[in-house]
Amino acid sequence: MFQLTSTIKENATLEIGLSEVKKPVPGADDLLIEVQATPINPSDLGTMIGAADVTSIRSEGSGTDTKLIMDVPESVMWAMKPRIGIPMPVGNEGAGVVVDAGENVKHLIGKVVSGVGGGMYAQYRVLPAMSCIEMGEGINPRDCASSFVNPLTALGMVETMKAEGHTALIHTAAASNLGKMLIKICNDDGIELVNIVRKKEQVKLLESLGAKYVCNSSDKNFKDSLVEAIKSTNATLAFDATGGGDLSGIILSCMEIAGRANMTEFSPYGSTHHKQVYIYGALNQSSISFPNNRSFGMYWGVGGWLLTPFLANAGMEKNIELRQRVSNEIMTTFHSSYTKEISLVDALSLDEIMVYAKIETGKKYLINPSL
């Protein structure tokens, strides 16, 4: 069987190719899944491409022997030392049909399941049954390929909001599959949500999904509209997928302006309600910048947010609850759309990688290793 791997070499190059490996054998509590659908998420590209220079890409070989090669800047090679020479399997999540199973989970043979555990860009994958979600009748692998990363991230944002005492959310890159899920969750759960996009057509799209507050960062009155949306919702927590540039700083500044509007007494430290931005993506590779005048007071925070530690801290009961909701709503709230379905060999095409590596909203690729 073949699986897609990414390897950093001693000569400061990264190589992506297909490795031929033995079909895995399931243990007593494991499932052997024929993978039929696995999405290309930004987190997958972090392993597949990482800090390599995509503009230096070249191709060698053909078919299953194709190798994509890119240069890795010498300045980051020190951080890559632990993975030099090690073929790293790629693909965080996916779905397929159970073709074999351990003695304790034989009842799942023939079932469609989604799973998470890495190495999903492969024809077959063994995963613990506990890492999988069994799907109902009529659900195919394409329908449930994205059952973990985006759905649980969106749900995790809402859970984080509740745990930290906030009452409304701000979300950037809101026209993404994840953003659409978050709109549906917040509408269903009665949570105010401010959506930030960067194109006029994205505003109309999200409004058609029921979004009440959509701010276009490309508009000249973006900051004013964001302040008004924050005043209306009292949003003091934001999740930023861009991870670079000045957007996080703008959000904090607009939160502060909205917060000061409700102050009855002056404070040299700004509004007293804590304002928080969590960065959970890296769509913008530039440095994060804040206004020179620190226009958001002193009650604020910026940090990273990751799904894995959130789930680890949430506990088993909450994990089961969230996964069950995803399973119940996989064709509605958590349904994902894809631009194109490609094979493992197609994923090594120069033309294809130059599209899916851009991580553009509305251009989501799905790999079908069974093709």
Residue ranges and their predicted role:
Residues S147-K220:
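Mid-domain Rossmann-like dinucleotide-binding core that forms the NAD(H)/NADP(H) cofactor-binding site
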Residues M1-V90, L366-L371:
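Short N-terminal strand-loop motif that marks the start
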Residues D188-E265:
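Adenosine-nucleotide cofactor-binding segment
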Residues V76-G117:
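A glycine-/small-residue-rich N-terminal strand-loop-strand element
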Residues K223-V227, K231, G281-E341:
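C-terminal substrate-binding/catalytic core of Rossmann-like NAD(P)-dependent dehydrogenases/reductases
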Residues G117-M130:
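A structural motif shared across PLP-dependent enzymes of the aminotransferase-like
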Residues D143-C144:
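C-terminal boundary of histidine-terminating zinc-finger modules
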Residues L252, A258-N262, T308-L371:
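C-terminal hydrophobic helical "lid"/dimerization subdomain
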